[in-house]
From Swiss-Prot:
Tetramer of two alpha and two beta subunits. One of its GO terms (molecular function) is glycine-tRNA ligase activity. Keywords: Aminoacyl-tRNA synthetase, ATP-binding, Cytoplasm, Ligase, Nucleotide-binding, Protein biosynthesis. The keyword Cytoplasm applies. HAMAP family: Gly_tRNA_synth_beta (MF_00255). It comes from Listeria monocytogenes serovar 1/2a (strain ATCC BAA-679 / EGD-e). It is found in: Cytoplasm. This is Glycine--tRNA ligase beta subunit. Belongs to the class-II aminoacyl-tRNA synthetase family.
Amino acid sequence: MSKDFLLEIGLEEMPAQYVTSSVLQLEKRVTDWLTENKIEFGEIKTYSTPRRLTVLVEGMAEEQANRVEEAKGPAKKIALDEEGNWSKAALGFAKSQKVDPADLTFRDIKGVEYIYIKKEVIGEKTSTLLPSLEKVVTSMTFPVSMHWGSNDLRYIRPIKWLIAMFDEEIIPFEITGVTTSNTSRGHRFLGKSATIKQPSDYPNALLEQFVVVNAEERKQAIVEQLRELESMENWQIKEDDDLLEEVTNLVEYPTVLSGNFEKEYLELPEEVLITTMKEHQRYFPVFSQAGELLPHFVTVRNGNHENLDTVARGNEKVLRARLSDADFFYQEDLKMTIDEAVAKLQNIVFHEKLGTLTEKMKRVQKVALMLADYLDWQEEDKQDIIRLTNIYKFDLVTNIVGEFPELQGLMGEKYALLQGEKPAIATAIREHYLPNSAEGELPQTDLGSLIAIADKLETLIGFFCVNIVPTGSADPFGLRRSAFGAMRIIQANGWNIPMLEVISRIVDMERAEGSTELPDADVKKEVQTFLKNRLRVILQGHHIRHDIIDAVIGGDPNVIPQLIDRAQILNEHAEAEWFRPTIEALSRVVKIAKKYEDGVEVDPALFENEYEQALFDKLEKLKFDYAGLTIIERLKAFADLRTTIDAYFDNTLVMSDNDELKNNRLALLFELASFIKEFAQMDEINVK
């Protein structure tokens, strides 16, 4: 037989951004508890609002199933005394397992006999186990938590009520003075207490008290009301999953309404208006069918349709004050020139160990010009780099960015255009912050891409130089994001920038600037390792086999686009019939070539057979062609070498007793191995 179980944690209003993750955590912890306690169950449903986290477990068994358990005890030589009687160790084991010593048996495990017992365990009633769920509730962790009253428990918000019901039976436990019951609380203003007769009644009982406990139903209700308003007003309300998720978790009983603001505010930059509405007020902006922003907004009320006009006027008043402030900030910003803004950057500390923003911009300028040289950019392009890196952070001192930090770069672009900067420079000011997430949009212009790479690499290496590095999950300065973003941009542009050399030169630059606390060699090695680990993440995102990732990163990790191409091509051909014998042959070359001693050059006059000459000829052709070959052509060239390599090893004793012959043969293999290892560490690839 089975019953349903309901667990509700009633709380003061939680931050909306943590509601969904918290209820999913509760679901997992309850699922794990049921599994650990060997209680069978059916479907688990989750419900959540800003004031409650709930799981409803359907079909929970009324008792654990009876089961047979085995337990291993001490070895036989310890379990029996000299007279063959049970020792204290054996008797203690039997007592701990609650079995009669007569039930003990022996079992051979890898040549050693141990005591074993088999015992039938009678399942306990579920209702006697459920009170221990109190530990599940109190063990939850949250990004933010608090104490309240005299309690030691830290929780996302104070617990106000608890429900724990196994069908009609209330499961008793208590947390911070709150005892479980079958009574929930309805909407804070519209509802009353709700008595739950049995778990399956829970959603409807709360709905009667103006609480939609199913988050997906609340979200769908909001979407339907938005679409209805769109149709009625001939508006366009653009989909915004993040905002929709947030407002869903801000309300218990959603009602959509609209409001208006003065048309003159449309003269503000659209981004300022939208950010004011979305980020500060959680309003949906309204557009015409042509995509133009309109002087209206849509919001979601936590309540019913009563007095919507009054609610709308209240929201309009709040937004009007926000927009008035934004307009003032914008007008003040327009009075300031870019040069005046740049002058203020020397008073803003980037980091206490890395100087001011002005000093950082100068370092980034050097890095950007270095990268431009590697890419053979023209003098005109370099002049754009100089102008850009002299000003690209200027909007950080503007009033709008001070009020709306998320508009950094965007406002820089707008202000730069208004003050007559080149469009390419203005665009790069915005793009240098990209990507702003793991899968975020990349810069679309060359100048924006270059400055984004330079800024991110200088940030990354600068912090490493002063021994500030990510540890575990802690990365307060976003260095993983900087590294990942820089490599994504390099890959997307296909720029063959020699990363190891660039890292070395930036570290030397930081040393010259006086902003380094560690030996240069240590910093260079740590940054290289850090970037290699970020490369692993990128390659894993391309679904590359782990052994192939190890192989290409163990090869030449210097040029990122080529490395990624090598990994993808090896991965694509890993199942080809020729792949295994080719990798085996190349790996054999690399392995034996490790015995080569420096200083010996290949002398064809010492060849004793045609197979040495054939391999030498193939190697000479490879040397001549290699630089002009594509990645796939290089792999095919290695594959074409396979039969020649096999024939060479079948007919040539590399480790000859004659040192001159041996060293000559090792020199030949070493030259070939240098090409192979640049492509990948072939012996890392699993072909078995």
